Amino acid sequence: MSYTPMSDLGQQGLFDITRTLLQQPDLASLSEALSQLVKRSALADSAGIVLWQAQSQRAQYYATRENGRPVEYEDETVLAHGPVRRILSRPDALHCNFHEFTETWPQLAASGLYPEFGHYCLLPLAAEGRIFGGCEFIRQEDRPWSEKEYDRLHTFTQIVGVVAEQIQNRVNNNVDYDLLCRERDNFRILVAITNAVLSRLDIDELVSEVAKEIHHYFNIDAISIVLRSHRKNKLNIYSTHYLDEHHPAHEQSEVDEAGTLTERVFKSKEMLLINLNERDPLAPYERMLFDTWGNQIQTLCLLPLMSGKTMLGVLKLAQCEEKVFTTANLKLLRQIAERVAIAVDNALAYQEIHRLKERLVDENLALTEQLNNVDSEFGEIIGRSEAMYNVLKQVEMVAQSDSTVLILGETGTGKELIARAIHNLSGRSGRRMVKMNCAAMPAGLLESDLFGHERGAFTGASAQRIGRFELADKSSLFLDEVGDMPLELQPKLLRVLQEQEFERLGSNKLIQTDVRLIAATNRDLKKMVADREFRNDLYYRLNVFPIQLPPLRERPEDIPLLVKAFTFKIARRMGRNIDSIPAETLRTLSSMEWPGNVRELENVVERAVLLTRGNVLQLSLPDITAVTPDTSPVATESAKEGEDEYQLIIRVLKETNGVVAGPKGAAQRLGLKRTTLLSRMKRLGIDKDALA
């Protein structure tokens, strides 16, 4: 049959019909408006729209009966295999009476969707050459439509096809928009909860944070994390109940695993969603929910916490409103459980690391105690000279306080031994002294090593690292070569000394620390302050109690003791049997300048032990000169005729106005090191201040 436009209505009539149908917001309204139009036009008593969903193979039906009753129905069986299926394969007008309809589609006729009628017509709904349903018209009298009436019905159908497609597109767009909004909101929730829980390394804090976030976003009032106990067949339960919105109740308990719903989830490793009744067989701690909410039916959702293939525990959610656990919410809760599992895994790992750390600390304390019992008060410090006696008296004086100590002295004078003695005599001796050489580490890594860093704080920071100040909490921190600390790092050290707090790199969280600082340097900090190479405020903080270590040349009476101690220690280490040291060897060694101090002396003795054959230490002069620089007074400023060393130094000091160091100082003019010149001045009884 060929169809032509409905010309007898005229353009205005066609426009009015189109406008009326286009104004309908949805398919049900469109069906109702269509029924009114065809009824007013005396074309039919009612009309309906049948849409075909190709993807789901379902049919949707919208109609308004003669009595005005709206009908909406959808299925994939009876309706989907009715007249709409025929029109999809044969896109021609389908018309029949009720008897023919009943014989062809008996199940549909018996469904009650179609009360008895006289005549039925279904015309295809098409858009862009694609049939997506049909538009049906029903007459109560058994009278077929004339050709002119079919023409009008077809015009109605064409308009309905355009409008129905627009409505479907609008609905689909709204659905897509709602879906995108829901996915966006879910993503925000997931990110917020992930950020909140992943930073928690304490199980109690983690559970509290998980509960707070889930309660906030899902209005769930009972949240628990259930973990297996180290005791067999036991469960540790960390629970939070929001009986009071502002004061949630936190509980921790250990229960038997047998017979619990949690046991079922541990075995199946699958989510469990269940409605509980008070009459159900429940574990005692599960029955507590009814004490909380009365005899209402409780809906429980138990989500497995998986780390790879390992089951860590169960996230247990309970609420007396079943609608909380919708399909969309369950999908999001599963994703949240995955993030919570990562946080639980991190927290358990942190617990284990903390336990091992505590054990190591205990073992270290025991070893420290043993070492303290073996060594004397001053450990390896050897010396009976007045200079060393004064140093050790200062050590005893300052050890019991928490004051910062600055140990000054040339390289090799034993600054670390003095620092260790101060620590061992202090109230902090129960913990290991932490030490660090500021000159032995690149400036870029020094801050991280001192204060620690968070994961991702800089390129290569793949894990959190604890700095020396944290390690030295309740103990002592020995900073050797503090004069080599970069200028830009000095304010941060000053802050720790003043406030006893600091921040790790990449973190804004303040960490409190209780550290006793012992610093050491072989540099002239006063001069560095004057040259703007060292902060004066940090210098004053460090210089609370300075201890000046004498160089070895200023305590020659200690050299024989040191030689003997080094000889026997090194010989024992090398498996040698040396029990005698010639007096001449001791006198020779005692007369040397030793610019490298005790360390240089120890190296010389070690070489002598290595070359000795027999049980008497053998040390020849070539051996000494090979390792000890010539310290004879070869000076840039030569002595005048009849002028001895004393007179030469006096004259040069007067010419330099008593200045010893620096490019215009006496040491430079004499070709000597500053320390060497000072040593000779002390030996000769020269006071530079009296000459200036």
UniProtKB/Swiss-Prot annotation:
Keywords: Activator, ATP-binding, DNA-binding, Nucleotide-binding, Transcription, Transcription regulation, Two-component regulatory system. ATP binds at residues 409-416, 472-481. PROSITE patterns: SIGMA54_INTERACT_1 (PS00675), SIGMA54_INTERACT_3 (PS00688), SIGMA54_INTERACT_4 (PS50045). One of its GO terms (biological process) is regulation of DNA-templated transcription. Residues 381-610 form the Sigma-54 factor interaction domain. The keyword Transmembrane helix does not apply. Pfam families: GAF (PF01590), Sigma54_activat (PF00158). Residues 202-344 form the GAF domain. SUPFAM superfamilies: GAF domain-like, Homeodomain-like, P-loop containing nucleoside triphosphate hydrolases. The keyword Signal does not apply. Required for induction of expression of the formate dehydrogenase H and hydrogenase-3 structural genes. This is Formate hydrogenlyase transcriptional activator. It comes from Salmonella typhimurium (strain SL1344).
